[in-house]
């Protein structure tokens, strides 16, 4: 099982290194891989793609999608609205520590008359995305 997980996350080239010698992305992958060894029923992932390169991020996102298809529950926090839109069945939008909306991405977009979660978020807080950039 461990070898298949190492292969899944493309970690064979650093499997014998100390964790302190790994990059942020490599450390993230090791953390998620450690969870997989135990075959949990659910995952709680706090910004698992933060600080990762695009390839490592995609490996993590593909893993999450696959685990969801296998019936696993994933609680996923992120600041990346596009990720939430692509992998989450339901989202909770939070602003300044307060819940401002809960629903599927499509429900929230319909309610705010927008076409994506990022625009929906700004519509809900009464600001424009240009003001925040």
Where are these regions (language model features)?
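Conserved ABC ATPase signature
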Residues: 18-22
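Catalytic Walker B motif of ABC-type/P-loop ATPase nucleotide-binding domains
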Residues: 43-46
